Amino acid sequence: MGKTRRNRVRNRTDPIAKPVKPPTDPELAKLREDKILPVLKDLKSPDAKSRTTAAGAIANIVQDAKCRKLLLREQVVHIVLTETLTDNNIDSRAAGWEILKVLAQEEEADFCVHLYRLDVLTAIEHAAKAVLETLTTSEPPFSKLLKAQQRLVWDITGSLLVLIGLLALARDEIHEAVATKQTILRLLFRLISADIAPQDIYEEAISCLTTLSEDNLKVGQAITDDQETHVYDVLLKLATGTDPRAVMACGVLHNVFTSLQWMDHSPGKDGACDAILIPTLTRALEHVVPGGAKFNGDARYANITLLALVTLASIGTDFQETLVKGNQGSRESPISAADEEWNGFDDADGDAMDVDQKSSSGEDQEEDYEEIDVKEDDEDDDDDSITSEMQADMERVVGADGTDDGDLEDLPTLRELIQTAVPQLIRLSNLPIDSDESLTIQSHALSALNNISWTISCLEFANGENANIHNAWYPTAKKIWRKTILPILEADSADLKLATQVTSLAWAVARVLHGETPTDGNPHRKFISLYHSSKQQAGGNSNSIEEPEDPFQGLGVKCIGVVGSLAHDPAPIEVNREVGVFLVTLLRQSNNVPPAEIVEALNQLFDIYGDEELACDKEVFWKDGFLKHLEEFLPKMRTLTKGIDKRTQPELRTRADEALLNLGRFVQYKKKHAPK
């Protein structure tokens, strides 16, 4: 009978630590022997002074990439967690937290996951409790401590805050775990509410709370329910100020309002919703002046400006939920699907274009539009003030007796976005690009405009639905087109990232304006040219543009979406013809065109030529023989669709299937309704 094998692990000096092989690189091997091993030996020394000195030394050398990698090989994390953080000497503990902070900052997110699995949250909670007690105790009061002692407390606090923020960002499950730690939340509330922390610690605390409060109902409720420091009231008061802390407070409050669903139609305490934050966020943008990156003489405003732009962009996106919830019960299907550019033909709809149904001139489309009796301005004033032109456009849209922005009284957030934020965003999108900072500001301003524009473009405006929003947005959309989109197009930048941003914005704006988009300078030709030039650049340099994970977010798809929207009735027939030929040509060259672009081209053709009553149907679709090309493309589309893997690209396959189905129906419908 065999003997049970003896467990040799118990005979090791340290069962957790495995023998570490020295690196094969001579330089690293020497560095390990001369610097790393001696300092690690001192870190585990019985002598308290040696341990403290070693911890401080490691906190310094861990910044160096080579030293950091060697320290990680030698199990420095295990030593710090089990020995340094429990040291009686506060200097050692401060150095230990500094080591973990730097490692978390320099390494990938997986390192934070590793720390979490080593139960670092327990150590953080214990340290946070100690800091909280030090700050709140009256014997002795914190203010009476020696400056050196206070500095050590703030050093530990700063390291804890950075670690908490990085851990929360690393993975959703860690985010949720941190949000349940009441001691951590109490420390954050105390640092924000009590005017005791240095500016850098305060900013780190509010940044950390912003991270934790994002999409987290528990944290949102904890903030509003806090009776110890009344942090919610403090944040509200801060948000009305004019200093950088006001913008930081707005970031937290926006997350709170979103998680608690305090919206325009269901505001929270004292009418709290995002509308009260927009004026403060917009004021922060006024510090950015032409000539640049100095931000009116204070470089500190750069980060605050970016935070304000990011928060406005988030408000622009989250406002879509407000529109959905506000329309529930009063309208059916007020929002079109944002991820579908055409919903196909509905078999249940009596107006569906199906040969098996009675024909009519209606169809189920996402991009329906109202026939608006309006003439475009031939000239645009260069005055920075937007108010007068917006009012003039408004009168053209709704008539002299029409309603004005007062119709948005029940949508204060949208009103503030249109009247207060968008003018500043337009201004920032046109800043002279003379530094990396100004380029970053422009990019974030475009992102905010893009989010706001797409949220509104996904509304249903057919048959007078959401007319008040359309009337308020229409002149603003034209202003964005003239003041932001056209200048960037005319600059003809080779920056494909910028081109992608402005094309996405143009698509969102054109979806609302349709064929009434200003045609100054033939923008459809510019976007067609941009489409072709992007293909040439991508073909010549694989690194010229990063392919998005979602194939429908590529520059090519966006260019197709823009030109399709520009061709909608009542666009000039020549514009319609040029766009139609471009789209049909893409289908004929389908072997060299990505499937997502083919799908978008088909959807745009369906939308443009779906109504046989429009002039473009006869003058372009039939005169230019588009039906023949669509019939010839049908078998190619079947082959293309079958070649898309459902497992690896499920959305692309689904939308390709829909486009194929609709193409067959569209061809049959057109054949049945050919002009006589």
From Swiss-Prot:
Region Disordered, residue ranges? 1-28, 325-385
GO BP annotations of the record are:
protein import into nucleus; ribosomal large subunit biogenesis
The UniProt keywords, alphabetically, are:
Repeat
Ranges of Basic residues compositional bias? 1-10
Entry-linked InterPro entries: ARM-like, ARM-type_fold, Nuclear_Import_Ribosome_Adapt
Which residue intervals are annotated with compositional bias (Acidic residues) in the record?
338-354, 363-385
Q: Note the segments forming the ARM repeats.
A: 183-216, 420-453
Is Repeat one of the keywords UniProt gives this record? Answer: yes
Domain of life the protein comes from:
Eukaryota
Describe the function of this protein. Involved in ribosomal large subunit assembly.
| Assembly notes | Component of a hexameric 5S RNP precursor complex, composed of 5S RNA, RRS1, RPF2, RPL5, RPL11 and SYO1; this complex acts as a precursor for ribosome assembly.
What is the similarity comment for this entry? Belongs to the nuclear import and ribosome assembly adapter family.
Q: What is this protein called?
A: Symportin 1
Its taxonomic placement starts with: Eukaryota, Fungi, Dikarya, Ascomycota, Pezizomycotina
